[in-house]
């Protein structure tokens, strides 16, 4: 019964009001909450794209070992992304406060987007059935997406 409930929940969350993005398609514009320079801010995709390509990397949870390492890797390569005129944004379901703490502690030079309502997670189809210590749950699949300056999804890494 528990597996059936999880499967049903997965089908419901996997059926967003809009189709998940695929490489070669134009990304839907969105505005959402984010943390920049230690303060709550907003992020708008079309506005960001005026400055060049955008990398959105989705990660499960702030301040966990794997997510910290991933964020540190993006931080350490930040100058290379800047040289390529590409902006980096991390996305998780964590709160703005959790993002503020995580960003400050790790000295991330990029914004962290709070997707507590899973709007972006559904758009990019990153909510997946996962297992941890034998328990099944719905969580974010670690994924990265490159959107060119025209708003077209060029590449995805999962």
Predicted segments, located by residue:
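Positively charged n-region of N-terminal signal peptides that target proteins for export
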Residues: 1-4
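Short, linear, compositionally biased motifs with a strong N-terminal bias
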Residues: 10-11
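Chalcogenol-based redox active-site neighborhoods
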Residues: 18-158
């Amino acid at each position: 019964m528990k597996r059936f409930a999880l499967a049903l929940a997965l089908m419901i969350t996997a059926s967003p009001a809009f189709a998940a993005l695929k490489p070669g398609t134009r990304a839907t514009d969105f505005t959402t909450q984010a943390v920049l320079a230690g303060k709550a801010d907003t992020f708008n995709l079309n506005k960001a794209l005026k400055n060049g390509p955008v990398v959105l990397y989705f990660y499960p949870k702030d301040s966990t070992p794997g997510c910290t390492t991933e964020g540190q890797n993006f931080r350490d390569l930040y100058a290379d992304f800047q040289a390529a005129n590409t902006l980096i944004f991390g996305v998780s379901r964590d709160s703005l406060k959790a993002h503020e703490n995580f960003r400050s502690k790790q000295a991330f030079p990029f914004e962290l987007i709070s997707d507590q309502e899973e709007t972006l997670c559904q758009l990019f189809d990153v909510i997946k059935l996962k297992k941890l210590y034998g328990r099944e749950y719905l969580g974010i699949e670690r994924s990265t997406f490159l959107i060119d300056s025209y708003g077209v999804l060029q590449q995805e890494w999962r």
